[in-house]
Curated annotation (Swiss-Prot):
The protein's enzyme class: transferase
Domain of life: Bacteria
PANTHER family: NAD KINASE (PTHR20275), NAD KINASE 2 (PTHR20275:SF9)
Gene giving rise to this polypeptide: nadK2
Its biological purpose: Involved in the regulation of the intracellular balance of NAD and NADP, and is a key enzyme in the biosynthesis of NADP. Catalyzes specifically the phosphorylation on 2'-hydroxyl of the adenosine moiety of NAD to yield NADP.
The protein's name: NAD kinase 2
Signal sequence, renumbered to the chain: none
An MF annotation (GO) of this entry: ATP binding
GO CC terms: cytoplasm
Residues given in the record as NAD(+) binding sites: 52-53, 124-125, 151, 153, 164-169, 188
Amino acid sequence: MDMERNRLYFFYKRDDKLIERVKPLIELAERGPFVVVDDYREANIIVSIGDDGAFLQAVRQTGFLPDRLYVGVSVLPARGFYCDFHIDDIDHMVEAAKNWKLEVRRYPIIEVTIDGAASFFCLNECSIRSQIIKTMAIDVFIDDLHFETFRGDGIIVSTPTGSTGYNKSVHGAVVDPLLPCFQVSELASLNSNRYRTLGSPFILSGSRTLTLKMSEETSHFPIIGLDNEALSIQHIERIDIRLSDRVVKTVRLKDNSFWDKVKRVFL
């Protein structure tokens, strides 16, 4: 890790219990070669303290900054996919930094554009579902090709790192984050003599654009999930999803690869 990066911003929930647990970490940083700042825009390292959900919030609320390093520190008994460090093991963090046992990993993110105007980024996934108990009808385009007309509860579009989350729970594939791609998975699709979809997840190259065109009856009540946040916009006609040119840079232990984490969590 570049030691010229020494301005830290700590992102965490300001409750009394967590403040007490974070205090020794801040004190250690201030005694070392780091400067702790109160504004993330002044930092070049953003440290998220909590769990994977907190890490997603940290990245989103600081604007998916491509020139910052993000570090995940867990407060739970087990480390997550984005948290390589544990708050109760400060010595391990210090030892790893001193002995160059860290490396920077660049994770792909997807860009979601709604009706050609508002754009949002996702590190895990974007999901499109109905706010009411009603089947959605969505025309699915890959680039300019009309691929299928989907009818069902919704669609999940996930990044490689997000493939272990919501996507996996609907039997999507786990994808290596070194692959520049994104995955499309169905939520309870209708398949019959009348309606037909592919009926399985599919993976698109990072050079592709996925376009979802809502039917008139579907456009009134969609809810868009952006990682762990929900966006409710009425009268959506079109959603374009592509792999962004941006990446999120994270600091991880060299001996804790993505597949190490998959094995630890699922096997």
